[in-house]
Amino acid sequence: MAGYPLPIKHLISELGKLPGIGEKTATRLAMHILRAPEGDARALADSILEVRDKIRFCRVCYNFSEAELCTVCRDSARDSSQICVVEDPDALMAIEDSGSYSGTYHVLHGVLSPLDGIGPEQLKLRELVERIRESGVREVILATNPNVSGDSTALLISRMIGPLAVTVTRIAQGVPMGSDLRYMDRMTLSKSLEFRRGMEKEP
């Protein structure tokens, strides 16, 4: 990268900060942007700025939204007695794409990961408990990924809401251990929701 002008180096460096993008891929993307028509390059830059300026968290479920409430929370046809707890908006969209769920969601924006410095305070857990207390929720479906961090987070949530009068369920173990909900096919995801199992709550 030593021979590139400084603006190109900066672009490669910024692209390289994206997940899964190494220096070679970042360089290839930078070259593509440089060779693209000016209108395309500006449209890309404008889209990035638009996302940063216009997207916020839904005040109810913490999904991404352009408005105070996301499209799911604005939909009066959704079953508000169910909350499906997911790690991130990507998992929410995967479940929506499966067409197998008609309730509401709560997005944690992460899972417990002590090595990464992520504890309960960094997740939307307190907001979840408050939401359950203040609404007529009857079932909380824990749809964190089936791995150590996801299972630990699900267990903590089940303990936190133990004193509340709600049923707590976990997506079925037909979902392979260590897999990611974002990349599952629709049928597998649909079945994991259909055959979800109850979790014991601590008083």
From Swiss-Prot:
The keyword DNA damage applies. GO terms for biological process: DNA recombination; DNA repair. InterPro entries: DNA_Rcmb_RecR (IPR000093), Rcmb_RecR (IPR023627), Rcmb_RecR_Znf (IPR015967), TOPRIM_dom (IPR006171), TOPRIM_RecR (IPR034137). A zinc finger (C4-type) spans 58-73. Residues 81-176 form the Toprim domain. Keywords: DNA damage, DNA recombination, DNA repair, Metal-binding, Zinc, Zinc-finger. Signal peptide: none annotated. SUPFAM superfamilies: Recombination protein RecR. One of its GO terms (molecular function) is zinc ion binding. The keyword DNA damage applies. Coiled coil: none annotated. May play a role in DNA repair. It seems to be involved in an RecBC-independent recombinational process of DNA repair. It may act with RecF and RecO. Belongs to the RecR family. This is Recombination protein RecR. It comes from Syntrophus aciditrophicus (strain SB). The gene is recR.
